[in-house]
Swiss-Prot record:
Keywords: Host cytoplasm, Host-virus interaction, Inhibition of host innate immune response by virus, Inhibition of host IRF3 by virus, Inhibition of host RLR pathway by virus, Viral immunoevasion. The keyword Nucleotide-binding does not apply. Interacts with host IRF3 and TRIM21; these interactions mediates degradation of IRF3 through TRIM21 and ubiquitin-meditated proteolysis. It holds the Pfam family ASFV_360. This is Protein MGF 360-14L. GO terms for cellular component: host cell cytoplasm. It comes from the Viruses.
Length: 357
């Protein structure tokens, strides 16, 4: 149950006040980082008065605010954020100083933090899907001695489950850096992307691979504009074709000079017919090679379809000269493959060519 003072602070923080009240807010303990604290009563995000809407890239969930307060040794705000609902266990993850550890324990945090609970918190932070959450996860778990007892197999499993992308790294820190970087790229959290890239310039290849894998062409466009990419378009196409329905990434790679035939054949190898038909819709034509690859990979119905070469043609409704990311996304928003529809109609009309496994 909240004390009267804590409840009063919460009520004040949930309302906007003019700058005339700044001195009072400072004395009231609702001041942080040169500005007043505001708490959104709906989403429980903490943000400053300069942001009039929630979910900006500077918003902090209560747990992220707690960790920041622990790092800055702000005992008053630690108590306040826990009273407002922050989990005190988050304050224990970074192995704080003794007096901070004691305070978080007094406020309800369990110590020592068990390995299952540590990994559960990692997954909780990954699910926040916010810029602040990604940066919080990086701050809490990279170079964290509590992870030294966690086996690499366990850590690999947890990070893959949360990101759906295979990760590699010589150390737990290296692995987790790539993990949080991948989540930032997946959701296009530009502030977090720039934060990671500024500190890890050697991860350019990883940045490009993740952006293409997650269909984030905004980030690829930025790298191209800054002339940072020194990777061949066909190699970029390889990353784009790894995931289903990565139409925008495939289109952007094609605009950079990647071969549509290469993209079509890669998609067959990856057993991804939706990406394959998208490449055909854009103008891929090397059906002889595609037929051989389909047969080699035991996709016999697809192999038989490619024998009917006159069945396929470029979809003229897809413009081939769009370069701006948002325009590409808009163009493909309602995209459906005309060549896929033709193939399905042909198989329905010619059931004799269907191979049943």
């Amino acid at each position: 149950m909240l004390s009267l003072q804590t409840l009063a602070k919460k009520v004040v923080a949930c309302n906007y006040l003019s700058s005339d009240y700044d001195y009072m807010l400072q004395r009231f303990g609702l001041w942080w980082d040169l500005g007043p604290i505001h708490l959104c009563n709906n989403c429980k995000q903490i943000f400053s008065y300069k942001h009039l809407q929630c979910f900006s890239e500077d918003d902090l969930c209560l747990e992220a605010a707690l960790v920041k307060a622990v790092k800055s040794d702000n005992l008053e705000l630690i108590r306040l954020f826990v009273d407002w609902g922050a989990n005190p266990e988050y304050g224990l993850i970074r192995v704080p100083a003794v007096h901070l550890k004691r305070l978080c324990t007094e406020l309800g945090g369990l110590t020592p933090v068990s390995e299952p609970r540590l990994l559960e918190i990692l997954k909780e932070v990954a699910k926040l899907k916010s810029c602040a959450g990604v940066l919080l996860g990086y701050d809490m778990f990279c170079h964290n001695p509590l992870l030294e007892t966690v086996t690499r197999t366990t850590l690999d499993t947890v990070t893959y489950t949360c990101s759906n992308i295979p990760l590699t790294g010589d150390t737990a820190h290296h692995l987790l850096t790539k993990f949080w970087f991948a989540l930032a790229l997946r959701h296009n959290f530009t502030k977090a992307i720039h934060y990671f890239y500024k500190r890890h310039k050697n991860h350019l290849y990883w940045r490009v691979a993740c952006s293409l894998y997650f269909n984030n062409i905004f980030d690829i466009h930025e790298l191209c504009r800054e002339k940072e990419i020194c990777i061949s378009p066909n190699l970029m196409m390889k990353f784009a074709c790894l995931r289903k329905k990565n139409y925008a990434a495939i289109y952007y790679c094609y605009r950079l000079g990647a071969s549509l035939d290469y993209g079509m054949n890669l998609s067959i190898y990856n057993n991804n017919t939706l990406n394959m038909f998208f490449c055909i819709d854009l103008g891929a034509t090397d059906f002889d090679r595609a037929q051989r690859i389909a047969h080699k990979t035991y996709m016999y119905n697809l192999s038989n379809i490619f024998l009917v070469k006159q069945l396929f043609s470029r979809d003229v409704t897809l413009a081939l000269d769009v370069t701006e990311p948002q325009e590409i996304y808009d163009m493909l928003k309602s995209y459906t493959s005309k060549n896929l529809k033709r193939a399905e109609e042909y198989l329905t009309a010619h059931p004799e060519i269907i191979v049943i496994d």
